Curated annotation (Swiss-Prot):
Its main location: cytoplasm. Keywords: Cytoplasm, Disulfide bond, Mitochondrion. GO terms for biological process: mitochondrial cytochrome c oxidase assembly. InterPro entries: COX19. Residues 1-26, 77-99 are annotated as: Disordered. Residues 77-86 have a biased composition (Basic and acidic residues). This is Cytochrome c oxidase assembly protein COX19. It comes from Eremothecium gossypii (strain ATCC 10895 / CBS 109.51 / FGSC 9923 / NRRL Y-1056) (Yeast).
């Protein structure tokens, strides 16, 4: 008796990871960018702040540059392009922090 039900031999074909899953940064190549982003999120108490989105963009760019994730357009990742990101960050930094 074989361990394969129905005695059918089927080759298992690997499937690519789902969109949004990517390799861990074992070498710590993007740790600094990640920590900047997480600290920003902590400061704004998890709100969707433009300056934090710019840091998220820097983190994802680092991951793409080090081939830890596939390159994609910023719009597909929910982030603004270069001009909009810089304008939003400069406008947000001019505002006083909320209490």
């Amino acid at each position: 008796m074989s361990g394969n039900p129905g005695s059918a031999l089927q080759a298992l074909s690997p499937t690519p990871p789902e969109r949004g899953s990517f390799p861990l940064d074992h070498e710590g190549e993007c740790t600094a960018q990640m920590m900047e982003y997480l600290n920003c999120m902590k400061l704004v108490r998890g709100e969707n702040a433009p300056n934090c989105r710019l840091l998220a963009r820097n983190y994802l760019k680092c991951r793409m540059d080090h081939r830890l994730m596939d390159r994609d357009e910023w719009a597909h990742l929910g982030l603004p392009d270069d001009k909009r990101a810089e304008a939003a960050a400069s406008a947000d930094s001019a505002r006083p922090p909320r209490q």
